[in-house]
């Protein structure tokens, strides 16, 4: 239902470039292990952090849908962002918007205030699939 009005595959395609290029992600390590964000970017093959560009949850007495994508600036020139914004608003106004996850407000505020631990992406090693098979 979330992507009913936004043409997409089950993976990122050209439609997503405008939305994800230079966009920030949220570190969702504090969320339940089995929660999958509706928009979940892939980290590198070195590190597999739990990241999201959108979450939906019940918080306090309401429902929350939060995204890090820019769906508000220059919509007259950004057709993809304009369509994603419309799709999200229509979804939130529909009966289909029923978040399965309930979070305390502190988890949401921590997304804005806590600094994620640094990740060192530098390596001198090769990916496992490129290493020689030693016996």
Summary of predicted features, one role per range:
Residues 1-79, 97-135:
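Catalytic beta-strand/loop cores that center a nucleophilic Ser/Cys/Thr
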Residues 80-93:
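Short amphipathic C-terminal alpha-helix that caps PH/PH-like domains
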């Amino acid at each position: 239902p979330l992507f009913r009005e936004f043409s997409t595959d089950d993976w990122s395609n050209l439609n997503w470039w405008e939305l994800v290029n230079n966009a920030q992600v949220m570190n969702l390590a504090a969320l339940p292990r089995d929660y999958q964000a509706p928009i979940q970017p892939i980290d590198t093959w070195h590190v597999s952090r739990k990241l999201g560009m959108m979450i939906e949850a019940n918080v306090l007495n309401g429902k929350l849908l939060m995204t890090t994508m820019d769906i508000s600036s220059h919509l007259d020139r950004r057709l993809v962002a304009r369509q994603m914004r419309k799709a999200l608003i229509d979804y939130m106004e529909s009966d289909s918007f029923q978040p399965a996850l309930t979070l305390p407000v502190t988890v949401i505020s921590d997304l804005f205030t806590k600094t994620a631990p640094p990740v060192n992406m530098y390596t001198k090693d090769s990916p496992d699939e490129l290493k020689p098979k030693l016996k």
